[in-house]
């Protein structure tokens, strides 16, 4: 499936923001979906990590938010890891502000799941808003957020080890695939040829 890159991410978030408010009680779903997609992308989360976040795993700090990942695919023993997501200058696309807004309207018991959805729902929500944004929803999956982060970070010249620190990859093999994708046009030999 295709990674979600910055321009597509912005289109998807705008589609969420523009969604009609006519259905009473659905406003919090809109806040959830925006926070889910922005946090998923910004943190390079796996779907399973994203849906397992509990309220007690979140700590808002002056710089942004710290999210504890208690267990993941590459951490079956449950050592845990903390992902730090800073505030973005662009408030419309800031994952920290989106998460705060959602929590303000949805706070529950500390032991409960923040997003309260299945990992399959992540893909369904993403596909739905991709279509609303005029994109081909069939080209995206829940993993598109994670691969989108890694590919975008590589496009912006972020070092391999820093991408791995955020995504939790233990080996460079997968991260290098994202970097290769990001560099298809950037380092293309045809850029040097003038016709």
Where are these regions (language model features)?
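Extended, non-catalytic subsegments within catalytic or DNA/protein-binding/adaptor domains
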Residues: 1-195
């Amino acid at each position: 499936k295709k990674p979600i890159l910055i321009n597509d991410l912005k289109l998807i978030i705008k589609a969420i923001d523009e969604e009609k408010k006519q259905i009473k009680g659905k406003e919090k779903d809109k806040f959830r979906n925006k926070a889910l997609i922005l946090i998923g992308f910004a943190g390079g989360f796996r779907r399973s990590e994203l849906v397992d976040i509990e309220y007690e795993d979140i700590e808002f700090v002056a710089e942004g938010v710290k999210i504890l990942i208690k267990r993941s695919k590459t951490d079956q023993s449950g050592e845990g890891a903390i992902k730090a997501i800073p505030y973005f200058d662009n408030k419309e696309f800031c994952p920290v502000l989106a998460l705060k807004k959602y929590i303000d309207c949805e706070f529950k018991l500390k032991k409960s799941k923040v997003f309260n959805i299945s990992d399959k729902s992540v893909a369904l929500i993403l596909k739905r808003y991709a279509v609303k944004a005029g994109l081909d929803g069939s080209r995206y999956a829940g993993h598109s957020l994670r691969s989108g982060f890694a590919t975008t970070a590589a496009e912006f010249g972020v070092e391999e080890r820093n991408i791995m620190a955020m995504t939790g990859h233990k080996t460079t093999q997968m991260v290098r695939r994202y970097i290769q994708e990001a560099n298809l046009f950037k380092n293309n030999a045809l850029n040097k040829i003038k016709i």
